[in-house]
Amino acid sequence: MGKAIKITMINYKGGVGKTTSVYNFCAGLRFLCGKRVLMIDLDPQCSLTNICLKSYSRMSAKQIKIEDLSIDKTVNYIFKEYLKQISLSIEPHFDLDDLILKNLYSGHNNSKYDGLDLIPTTMFDTENSNYPKGLDDLEIDIARQHLGDNTLLNHITILAKFFTCTKIEELYDFIVFDCPPANSLITQNALVVSDYYLIPSIMDDMSSYGIPHMHNLIQNTIFRQVKELYAKVLESTLETKYLDYLRKNAPGLLGIFETLRKTNVDNSSIRRLIAKKHVLFDSVIYNHVDTARTTSDGLACFSVDINKDVYSPHTCYGKLVDEVLTHIGYPFDKVALQTKTNQWM
């Protein structure tokens, strides 16, 4: 297995079905194409972690909640360990077997699927604190760290150091980040190590302005300016292999896919406007209350009998997986994908 394709799923606007899409897209990569997939929850709201724990609890016949997770089994631990390294010069150590929630999926008739994993997050970290903390608290802790001229560089390369140290991307075919609807330092960490970013979006007037703005922010304000600011450091031959993530090109916009569309709404004019500037996938994820409800219970759309013909969630997400893999030139069996789309996961 080579290095994983790394995708950040992101939209700075909330309420677009991002986490639901992360879960179903990743389940599709695993079920339809047989790929080993790691999800990493970087959203302080912990929604993806909640969903995955529901599935894992069903599989293990033991209810596990976010507050039951020890800190060393969360992504919070990664950021905390590197903050310790900065302040106390303590070298981080990670046990991926402990950190990663492995083979978490239990689907139709409690069928089990390996190869769909998660690094969870928590909002119940009470280590060295008299109240529970989450990733948003760590965001503040990171911002408080001042390291002279290299402050920003250190802030946005924490995950780059972790990926370099653990070689985690050699264990998977795909790694997908679920990021908060904000341009946070933690989001920037995900973008630094990513090959692509994928935008789920409602097709409305705000999106026609917001998507180009977010694209320019990522490409220019974040990456171009950082590379210019730290050009000498990045050109250095010193042993800083983790900086290779910044030495490469900025992550590419993989594309945009429409979410939460109502079947009686015509938004073709907005789609044409967005498609003039960016890749807009044909795949449309329709607005079904059932999809959100079953996903929140830890069931992917491929495990649920929601029969709505061409609007069915399993058909829509199956098409999205097909389009994404085709767009990046990733080899897969298209006939097998289309066949498995109508089978139970």
What annotation goes with each model-predicted range?
Residues 1-345:
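P-loop NTP-binding core
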